Amino acid sequence: MKKNKLFIVVVIYLSFPLLIKSQSIEGKITDGENALEMVDVYLKGHNYSCKSDSVGNYSLKKVPFGTYILETSIVGYTKFSKKIKIDSKQNYKIDVNLRGNKIVLKELVVSGTLKQVNRMESLVPVEVYNSKFLNKNPSSCLFDALQTVNGIRPQVNCNICNTGDIRINGLPGPYTMVLIDGMPIVSSLSTVYGLSGIPNAMIDKIEVVKGPASSIYGSEAIGGLINIITKKNSSSPQFSFDSYATSWSELNTDVSAKFNIGNKISVLTGVNNFYFNNAVDKNKDGFTDISLQKRISIFQKWNIERKNNKQFSLAARYFNEERWGGETNWRKEFRGGDSIYGESIYTKRLEIFGNYQLPTKEKLFLSFSLNNHHQDSRYGTSSYIANQSVGFAQLVWDKKINKNDFLVGAAIRNTVYDDNTTATSLEFGGLNNPSKIFLPGIFVQNEYKIDSAQSILTGIRYDYNSVHKNIVTPRLAYKIILKNKSIIRLNSGTGFRAVNLFTEDHAALTGARKVVILENLNPEKSFNTNLNYTKKFSFNNKKELTFDLSAFYTYFNNRIIPDYLTDPNLIIYKNINGYGVSRGLSMNVDFDFNETTDIILGGTFLDVFIKENQQKNQQILTENFSASWTISHKIEKYDLRIDYTGNLFSPMQLPLIGELDPRNEKSPWWSIQNIQLVFFGIRNFEIYGGIKNLFDFLPGKNNPFLIARANDPFDKNIKKDSNGNVIVTPDNPYALSFDPTYVFAPNQGRRYFLGLRYSLF
């Protein structure tokens, strides 16, 4: 009898799970067009939850029969809530369409602290510019796309090859750290021409931090950083095509496609091609107004779905460009010769980068990248051939403990640079000696929430530079929300930067001037602080206004400034015997009216100077005031949108090359404005067209010439005195030598454009 009772108990025990009837709830989550990943899906009040995968699918397994409330949650979208009753044998399929909160989505940021938060909640002021903003003034690359961002100026550094850098708050390009998906992939050599190789088609959004960011990104982020966030596979269309042509015979084409490999892997591939092969010389100086360019960029991103929605993505980009500028009758056979002047640059670049979340309970993320950049260039008879490889890896631990939100990380970067100049040769013997810099580092950052209105962020980073040894960069940030809901943020930090003249100053390569280095150059050191005030106003009928005001101050020791003025034939480099300062005020106003009219206005006042031997000198090629605007208006009745964009710059001091140089010492007030009309009345299509440089501004106006001695680019006919100074002759009345560095704006006038954009989801 006891055995029978035991048998019955065992049978009932083993059968008990079968007596509880259960089913699965599954479906797909989208925003109406794109799949949404990492959405929290749960049954309210019960321990059943999951996250949507990379293609938006979710599944709640073994849910017992009963009545529940199914809910979803993700930052930037309205919450979904639905009452459901499970009482059948069939699995429940419930697809969810979430409506995005436009303002919140636009303001999700990650660059300030390496954590994704709403922009208003971030202790670090971050500006966000998404792909829709970039499309309001169509361009082929990152360099051109930033023309209408307040406080940022893409600076053209050569009238012939059109190399340039991106300046934040008046500081030259090398003080700006450019990241791709949070990684320092854009190396110093690639800033010379590589910025034109980052196509807008691969950009989901651009995040800009103006001011100190050294504790998590490294000491080189002195002036600020630009973080290019690449497109997500889940939100990209299955196929897209975007192409436009201009009246200058420029043709830019972007094509992308997405496909899946099995159920776990999603692959996004994009190709950009820019073609301009039309030598234009509208100012009749015998030289091309802008350089001719043929480039292709191929981008591919793999997203691998893993258990528990752990992250794993891999991406690669290949970039190849040929560009030349010079005398309009230059051909490849003249490359490097002294009969017809040309600047010819061949660039090849390969990048591989990824992000992997470790399979642990703790939030551990490993990011890694490898890039190689090769440049083969001729500037007249001067040859510059350089190669740079950079390997990078970083492990980050994201941990919350009570009111403390920690970020702890370790990073390692190895940079190898070699060229055919004396910069990478031994002082004695002339043997090749590539520059090798090994840079391991650790950092700790903690965000402490004092109360509901106040937070403080502290951070410190230690790097060991194999050349310059120990580098310590602290960081401090404070945020307070006032009673009127306005926000005040204070950020301070330090910076440290070693200078590579030949990758940072294009004028050192042209051969037009001789480079003189007076001493062993010490690394630059800086202290900077930024005070920010933000206030958002909400009105009836979905109207929004955001006001943003910042004051910034940067103090430099050991500042290295190229001296063009002491001797017109030389570029003299040395650490200044004094200090440098960059300070100013910046204001942004963003209006959003009923989703039909958007207005973004910005203005920046700058005071950038060097004080040496009790003498204060303004930094050349630096404006005291700049403004930018983007105005968009939809005419729904006709399916049209009008975009009006532009910028304005105050006069800046320009580099003359002699006392008799007849060119203006300062630039005029100047502005480049654009207008675009977009028709979106055909499903999945946009047809757009407009005018760039609407009022046909050219830097050569009111100047006798831009390029000095364009008729004698090899200086074959100049005469010099016994001290090597150029003297006046009938052929050279201003005692000048060839010099193309007098440049402050693009030498490209008004042009019309027409394009077609297609997306299939």
Explain the meaning of each model-derived region.
Residues 143-184, 204:
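Extracytoplasmic beta-strand/coil segments of soluble accessory domains associated
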Residues 276-297, 303-364, 370-389:
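Flexible loop and strand-edge segments within Gram-negative outer membrane beta-barrel domains
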Residues 61-62, 165, 183-210, 298, ...:
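Short acidic/polar hinge/loop motifs at secondary-structure boundaries
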Residues 449-452, 547, 551-555, 575-656:
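Gram-negative outer-membrane beta-barrel transporters
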Residues 365-377, 481, 489, 522-575, ...:
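Membrane-embedded beta-barrel scaffold of Gram-negative outer-membrane proteins
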Residues 92-96, 142-145, 164-167, 193-199, ...:
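N-terminal periplasmic accessory domains that precede
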Residues 30-34, 39-44, 73-77, 87, ...:
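Short, acidic, small-residue-rich periplasmic hinge/interaction motif at the N-terminus
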Residues 648-655, 679-761:
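C-terminal beta-signal and adjacent terminal beta-strands/loops
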